[in-house]
């Protein structure tokens, strides 16, 4: 594993080899086997959403035990990388189709510390993640690009990741995906005893959803 950058200064670093490529492949295969066993396909999880131009396959850790176990299992190493005592919040797997983008945005409080992990590219072509250089105080609207704000662009291979503070830094993928598809895992943590600790294990969102169902 190789870390490039200064997390305490820039709120992000590139982590090469966070996960072995073989494990990334095995995770994708396990997800597909589990989905098929339930009588569904990846495409049945495709959703239209504001962040993307096209419908994207999205599966959350609440829907998949392997994804949840992956989040919990990475917690010690991400705590070490950030220098903070972390609790897991939530994670999700996403497949972006060819030509898609991820609009520039900042995240909700449950994404205090975030990891964007590349799992697979259908054509082996890196699809960079862009991160703004200016911290944001409040969530901003979705944008196609960063406007006048300078940003960094980080290329990743399968198994590589970017660790960043999703609440404080705007981020996205503003160039169209050059692959037929690409698979990614996004993992989120909050600090134990911190301002966002109430979001550990995604408790705030799950509580709101439960209250909505009872209403």
Give the residues covered by each predicted segment.
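A short coil-to-beta-strand element that immediately follows conserved catalytic motifs
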Residues: 83-92
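Conserved active-site beta-strand element of glycosyltransferases/polysaccharide synthases
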Residues: 95
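Histidine-centered active-site/metal-ligand motif
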Residues: 105, 170-171, 188
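Non-heme Fe(II)/2-oxoglutarate
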Residues: 1-82
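Short, well-ordered beta-strand micro-motif
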Residues: 14-16, 163, 188
């Amino acid at each position: 594993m190789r870390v490039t950058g200064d997390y305490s200064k820039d709120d992000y670093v590139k982590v090469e080899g966070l996960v072995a490529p073989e494990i990334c492949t095995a995770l994708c295969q396990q997800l597909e086997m589990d989905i098929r066993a339930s009588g569904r396909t990846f495409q049945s999880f495709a959703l239209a959403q504001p962040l993307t131009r096209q419908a994207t396959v999205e599966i959350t850790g609440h829907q998949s035990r392997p994804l949840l176990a992956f989040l919990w299992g990475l917690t010690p190493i991400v705590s070490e990388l950030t220098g903070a005592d972390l609790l897991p919040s939530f994670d999700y797997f996403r497949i972006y189709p060819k030509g898609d983008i991820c609009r520039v945005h900042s995240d909700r409080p449950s994404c205090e510390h975030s990891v964007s992990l590349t799992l697979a590219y259908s054509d082996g072509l890196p699809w960079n993640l862009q991160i703004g250089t200016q911290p944001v105080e409040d969530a901003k609207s979705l944008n196609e690009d960063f406007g006048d704000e300078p940003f960094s662009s980080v290329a990743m291979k399968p198994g590589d990741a970017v660790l960043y503070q999703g609440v404080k830094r705007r981020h996205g993928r503003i160039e169209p995906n050059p692959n037929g598809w690409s698979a990614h895992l996004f993992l989120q943590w909050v600090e134990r005893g911190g301002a966002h600790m109430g979001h550990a294990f995604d408790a705030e969102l799950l509580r709101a959803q439960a209250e909505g169902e009872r209403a």
